[in-house]
């Protein structure tokens, strides 16, 4: 047993300095605001945009550890209580801290607001989730940013409208967001199918290292799970992979994570440029 077999007590951390909520920032490792700004500037110098994400209203255990009253008593403390006005006060303050001013901490054109894996057990909470999603899309837009979300609106199917125009959706699992329906609604998609592009180091599920040979020879961003769009479909903006460190204390170091990232990054970068065409066989690409 770990954490007394209580999910609400598991390890969680927010890794960016916060002056609005000083006790929120992790003490065992974090970026100061200046460090994060400098990192973004470094990326800009090589034409890379860092898109910061504050994931809510699920995956938010770090927030409810800091402010327990905004955690959901029904769905677990890693879910925010969407019926509590303090939840919105907290999230408004957090986003505002990094978005306001002439030189905001979040420098780029886009900000990801999360919206991943919230419970859909109750129709009433589904409508509140959709309301939350729409609210924070518009909130980050009010600071001049383009909003990005995780695909969840098939899982959270409901009546409350959620803004889709100029919104980018990370399409990770078709059961959560059916790709063609999302495109029909107006979203632009980033293809990140979990069964092909998820790395969870030394966990025993998903990939420890991506199957780069399979990706190189068979996959393009037009393949969103089992749905295959036309190559260069304007609704598909590109693709990506993810590294999720679900297990801490399992012997995986930062260097180990980098070792998993490099071949994945190299392979997907080539696929973003070339699509279905392959200038060299995989074996030759792998040697290079």
Predicted regions and their residues:
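Active-site beta-loop-alpha junctions enriched in small/polar residues
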Residues: 3-5, 55-59, 116-118, 152-155, ...
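Flexible, acidic glycine-rich loops studded with aromatic residues
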Residues: 159-167, 174-288
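Short, conserved beta-strand edge motifs with alternating hydrophobic and charged residues
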Residues: 17-18, 150, 190-193
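Acidic carboxylate-rich catalytic motifs and surrounding loops in phosphoryl-/glycosyl-chemistry enzymes
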Residues: 149-156, 282-283
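Alpha-helical scaffolding within the catalytic cores
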Residues: 93-100, 155, 176-177, 224
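Structural preference for beta-strand elements that scaffold enzyme active sites
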Residues: 47-51, 108-112, 146-148, 166-170, ...
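Short glycine/threonine-rich loop-to-helix capping motif typified by GTGT followed
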Residues: 119-132, 159-174
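Substrate-binding cleft of carbohydrate-active enzyme catalytic domains
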Residues: 1-143, 147
